[in-house]
Amino acid sequence: MIKFNIFFNGQLFVSNELNFFIQTNQSKILFVFHGLYGRARNWQSMAKKLSLDGSIIVISVDLRNHGENLFDEDHSYSLMMEDIIKLFNYLNIKKTNLLGHSMGGKLAMLLSLTYPEFVNKLIIADIAPIDYQDDEGEIINSLLDLDLNLIQSRNDADKILSIKIVDKSLRMFLLQNLQLVNGRYEWGVNLKVIKKSMNNLKSFPILNEVKKNNQEALCIYGANSKYVTNTNLVSFKKYFANISFKKIEGAGHWLHVEKPELFFETISIFLNN
């Protein structure tokens, strides 16, 4: 079963204590899907804050080949959708809200378009429903080239990665996946499978005959991001008839980390409106 964390009243629940509440308050549930190289834990502080007043239950999910999930030999949006639908069925979710960042944002959009009956409101964080041509190869090759047998600490890894990955904040984010297991460092993300699946992850694999979605949707994006721009904003209208946009000044792709207060305020207003 896919790994997930439940936050309510600012607290983390790891059992079925909230099952009854989940069944009777589904319009107040928000599922959060992280981006590539991310994990549910990255969203812990935001999830706690969103759930603090008791009006929202936040369920943050480790997507396949990331975080605490078991590694699998395949990775695609269709498989991730299957994982999430299985989770919905396990929790007896009939209708819910979705928030996805980057890869998780594409997953949330695809779920909303493919299984609209499950989705109440949709929040997309800094990704567009398009095929991206950007070459992510340098990042994943740098991680795969790192000889973990020579690594004694995260600082060692950071020094080596800094030769090819100049952005320190990006390195710090990536190195969150480096974990010490039985005295040896290992990656907490299935890099080989991710590399093999990169073409699928850069695409937006939706069927042409999909119906335009009328659900209430919000795209929140960083003014300094290369992923959502004035040029590709029009792509959302092809799929989402009822979408609004919020640009966060001074933020890039990791807008929820760079401008957490404004990000929190924006999605809180949207969910509670």
Feature roles, as predicted:
Residues 183-239, 244-247:
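Conserved serine/cysteine hydrolase catalytic core
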Residues 25-70:
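Conserved HGGG/HGGXW glycine-rich cap/lid loop of the alpha/beta-hydrolase fold
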Residues 251-260:
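Catalytic histidine-centered segment of alpha/beta-hydrolase-like enzymes
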Residues 134, 149-203:
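Conserved alpha/beta-hydrolase catalytic His-Asp/Glu region
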Residues 100, 104, 108:
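Gly/Ala-rich beta-loop-alpha elbow adjacent to hydrolase catalytic centers
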Residues 10, 47, 57-99, 265-268:
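Active-site loop/oxyanion-hole signature of alpha/beta-hydrolase fold enzymes
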Residues 110-113, 120-151:
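Flexible "cap/lid" loop of the alpha/beta hydrolase fold
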Residues 1-31, 52-56, 93-94, 271-273:
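Alpha/beta-hydrolase fold catalytic core
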